[in-house]
């Protein structure tokens, strides 16, 4: 089949939405589908972007990058996408991944070019953007979004928890679930020559308030009283970076904290492989891809008991799910993993097996094709 995929997020800089899109198009291309991607241009990462786009072209994926300006993208993207669809309107489906793509394409004048479209939801959807962004609210009405999602061939949530939340909060119709998956060929377990005299606790995410990385820094400081050989790796960039550095300085742990910055897939995989425990204490996750990535590299994980984390982590098997409001439990579970090598290996191995069996690119491709076959059957 021939797909046009429109996504506001995509590597080199991407959160869960962009990463999911990257995996989805690779999974579909591997199964013989034709893919054209329209996404954001990152001028500050132009060289890395070129490498990513070259790799996509080698998989027969065409990538079109568009400039993004926070307050005017609605108009510029609308014009570019409309003109493109006027010239190329032979797609079987248009996939609209995330809020930006859905806000742009919900316009009636553009929707007439969208014969069949499928939306992917990664959070509280475009409704949330509308509620928070006064500028967007000037041009979009809630009823327009209601009609937009009603007319979609399918609306897909990346976790069962998110599906339930969308049905309850905005009554989104025609919702299906296709769980997040990862590239388990890129994230693999390779035994590393780890420093036997050191332990490494790792976290990776966008460094924004919602990821609650500051709680990890404070937990790490407390754990160093038990493990003087413990080091903390923080991968990612974002608005919280300077605050985190200041907190590490205040707690006098700066020499033991490594801020890795933004890492590509290969670098992130290597970081996981060198880690003993992965932790992310977000206030909310629609799923939590990083838990799967770490598990795929043989690392046990700890995540907060929120949202789709409950589906990403099998509690007591691939890691631990901990309550955000109980610092003692978070501390005790992390301490347990750091102190028990056999338990770390057991959970790391179980996590890797689980990812390979349930969350591979092949699984993602099969699940999406299964959905498409169901849509065809409904039409017949």
Task: Set out the residue ranges of the language-model regions.
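Carbohydrate-associated surface elements
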Residues: 161, 181
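Short hydrophobic beta-strand element within catalytic cores of glycosyltransferases
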Residues: 300-303, 313
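Aromatic "clamp/platform" in nucleotide-sugar-dependent glycosyltransferases that forms part
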Residues: 283
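Membrane-proximal helix-turn-helix segments that form the acceptor-binding/catalytic region
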Residues: 137-155
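An aromatic- and histidine-rich active-site surface loop
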Residues: 7, 45, 76-79, 93-126
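Conserved donor-binding/catalytic core segment of Leloir-type glycosyltransferases
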Residues: 193-220, 224, 233
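Short alpha-helical donor nucleotide-sugar binding micro-motif in glycosyltransferases
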Residues: 262-263, 270-275
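Conserved acidic donor-binding segment of nucleotide-sugar-dependent glycosyltransferases
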Residues: 315-316, 320-327, 336-341
């Amino acid at each position: 089949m021939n797909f046009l995929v429109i996504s506001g997020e995509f590597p080199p800089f991407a959160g869960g939405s962009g990463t999911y899109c990257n995996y989805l198009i690779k999974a579909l291309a591997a199964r013989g589908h034709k893919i054209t991607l329209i996404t954001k241009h990152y001028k500050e990462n132009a060289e890395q972007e070129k490498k990513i786009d070259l790799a996509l072209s080698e998989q027969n994926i065409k990538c079109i990058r568009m400039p993004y300006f926070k307050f005017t993208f609605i108009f510029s993207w609308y014009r570019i996408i409309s003109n493109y669809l006027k010239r190329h309107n032979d797609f079987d489906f248009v996939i609209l991944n995330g809020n930006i793509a859905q806000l742009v394409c919900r316009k009636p004048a553009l929707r007439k070019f969208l014969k069949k479209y499928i939306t992917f939801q990664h959070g509280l959807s475009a409704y949330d953007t509308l509620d928070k962004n006064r500028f967007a609210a000037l041009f979009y009405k809630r009823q327009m979004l209601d009609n937009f999602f009603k007319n979609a061939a399918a609306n897909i949530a990346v976790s069962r928890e998110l599906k339930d939340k969308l049905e309850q909060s905005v009554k989104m119709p025609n919702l299906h679930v296709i769980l997040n998956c990862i590239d388990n060929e890129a994230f693999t377990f390779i035994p590393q020559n780890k420093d036997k005299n050191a332990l490494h606790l790792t976290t990776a995410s966008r460094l924004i308030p919602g990821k609650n990385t500051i709680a990890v820094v404070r937990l790490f400081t407390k754990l160093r009283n038990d493990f003087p050989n413990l080091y903390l790796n923080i991968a990612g960039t974002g608005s919280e970076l300077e605050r985190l550095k200041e907190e590490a300085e205040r707690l006098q742990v700066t020499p033991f904290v490594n801020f890795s910055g933004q890492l590509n897939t290969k670098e992130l995989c290597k970081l996981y492989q060198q880690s003993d425990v992965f932790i992310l204490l977000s206030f909310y996750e629609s799923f939590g891809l990083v838990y799967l990535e770490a598990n795929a590299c043989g690392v046990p994980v700890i995540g907060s008991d929120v949202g789709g984390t409950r589906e990403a982590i099998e509690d007591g098997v691939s890691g631990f799910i901990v309550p955000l409001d109980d610092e003692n439990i978070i501390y005790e579970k992390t301490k347990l993993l750091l102190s028990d090598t056999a338990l770390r290996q057991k959970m790391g191995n179980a996590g890797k097996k689980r990812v390979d069996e349930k969350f591979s690119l092949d699984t993602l491709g099969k699940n999406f094709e299964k959905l498409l076959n169901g849509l065809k059957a409904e039409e017949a």
